[in-house]
Design a protein with these regions (language model features):
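Active-site-adjacent structural elements that line small-molecule/cofactor binding pockets in enzymes
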Residues: 1-295
Length: 295
């Protein structure tokens, strides 16, 4: 088992201690440091800062939102950071949700699984540099079709100018639903589950065969050292209430749906209802201790 440190993203105030955290994690033998993004700090920039001050620890996004960048941009950022860090970068990606992608980035959420598969395919092609990149997927065609709206009709297939340090930069996929989880096992080097319960493997419909050698499951496990169990669970419950209650629309929240599949449907709906009605403290207290402790 490898240990990683999840730094996440900025919340109400910028967190400026990421370098000291990374250095301590590296000195303690941690394998990796992970950043995330929502609609505050981005996932890549903090890793550049960390990479300049460390030498061994892996630098990983967990996750970078697919709707925020084109596949080519993701490939360029991954290649650049991997090269500058001496081959330490891991690209963790995920679809996020329609509320953020359409409300913040102004992009259609569309068919997320198909879009994810096309994105991974394009990134692989770009990094391999076998030939100028083309893609005929319905969601992310390359070049942009000449007959598409607002097209100038001048796009042509291009190939990455420079040779990457590693053409096989590992890709991890953040996934909660069975189809997306299956895609992670089929196309990626690792799976990033947001909530994972080892006692409920049937929830995730994990494959029993054809798993890639060295495939990794990078699970977030929140640790809070304290004397009181209820106090220790409170921080976890606050995070869960935010995601289950507010990180998605009332009609479609992937985190709420996952909690429901884990046997907490009424509790999940109650948390969401309280959170969206402005009763955030009540939403936190509505998260069952058993659920918070399980994951």
């Amino acid at each position: 088992m490898k240990l990683g440190a999840q730094y996440g993203y900025w919340t109400r105030e910028p967190k400026l201690d990421i370098v000291s955290v990374a250095l301590e994690a590296e000195n303690l033998g941690y394998d990796s440091l992970w950043t995330g993004e929502s609609y505050s700090s981005d996932a890549f920039t903090p890793l550049c800062w960390v990479g300049a001050h460390t030498s061994k620890i892996k630098l990983a996004t967990g996750i970078a939102q697919l709707g925020a960048r084109t596949p080519a941009t993701l490939a360029m950022q991954a290649m650049t950071l991997d090269t500058l860090s001496g081959g330490r970068f891991c690209l963790g990606i995920g679809v996020s949700g329609p509320q953020v992608i359409e409300g913040w980035h102004g992009q259609p959420f569309g068919k997320p699984i198909a879009r994810t598969k096309e994105t991974i395919n394009i990134i692989r092609k770009i990094l391999l540099r076998d030939e100028p990149v083309t893609a005929d997927g319905p969601n992310l065609p390359l070049p942009y079709p000449k007959d598409a709206p607002n097209s100038w009709g001048l796009g042509k297939p291009l190939k990455l100018i420079n040779k990457p340090l590693r053409p096989d930069i590992p890709i991890y996929l953040g996934a909660e639903g069975p189809k997306n989880i299956a895609l992670a096992f089929e196309e990626c080097e690792g799976w990033l589950p947001l909530y994972y319960s080892p006692s409920r493997p049937e929830i995730y419909q994990l494959p029993h065969s054809k798993v890639k050698e060295n495939f990794e499951i990078a699970v977030n496990v929140n640790v809070n050292i304290c004397d009181n169990i209820s106090e220790g669970l409170f921080m976890q419950k606050a995070i869960l209430a935010f995601y289950i209650g507010g990180m998605g629309a009332q009609k479609r929240n992937f985190h709420t749906e996952l909690m429901a599949r884990m046997g907490y449907e009424s509790e999940a709906n109650n948390i969401q209802s309280l959170f969206l009605s402005g009763k955030r403290d009540e939403a936190i207290h509505a998260v069952p201790d058993s659920f918070a402790d399980e994951i």
